[in-house]
């Protein structure tokens, strides 16, 4: 495995561990999720370019579209929660209440 791919996989694992460790704050969880999406984008782009998959050149772009949608929804949720409760602790949220 080349060193670039190894570094990207380590970045994904680091973001995943950050997601598991810092799951008490919504902002930290969203940042780790964005790091995971970025490393998945780079790894899929490198894989497609190295293996010459001409039929799947749109896959990284589609991944970026979903990452942008996820970031927009996460930011809207973060703003709503911080305006309502004044903090971004996930433990204080009860999602069953309307």
From Swiss-Prot:
Subcellular location field: Mitochondrion inner membrane
One family name in Pfam for this protein: Oxidored_q2
InterPro entries the record matches: NADH_UbQ_OxRdtase_chain4L/K (IPR001133), NUOK/Mnh_C1-like (IPR039428)
EC number, UniProt record: 7.1.1.2
GO molecular function: NADH dehydrogenase (ubiquinone) activity
Record's subunit section: Core subunit of respiratory chain NADH dehydrogenase (Complex I) which is composed of 45 different subunits.
Protein name per its UniProtKB record: NADH-ubiquinone oxidoreductase chain 4L
Organism: Eulemur rubriventer (Red-bellied lemur)
Record lineage: Eukaryota, Metazoa, Chordata, Craniata, Vertebrata
Encoding gene per record: MT-ND4L
């Amino acid at each position: 495995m080349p060193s670039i791919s190894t570094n990207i996989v380590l970045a994904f694992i680091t973001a995943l561990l950050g997601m598991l460790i810092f799951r008490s704050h919504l902002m930290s969880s969203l940042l780790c999720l964005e790091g995971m999406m970025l490393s998945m984008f780079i790894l899929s782009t490198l894989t497609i370019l190295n293996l010459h998959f001409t039929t799947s050149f749109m896959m990284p772009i589609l991944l970026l579209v979903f990452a942008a949608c996820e970031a927009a929804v996460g930011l809207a949720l973060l703003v709503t929660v911080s305006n309502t409760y004044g903090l971004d602790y996930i433990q204080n949220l009860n999602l069953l209440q309307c």
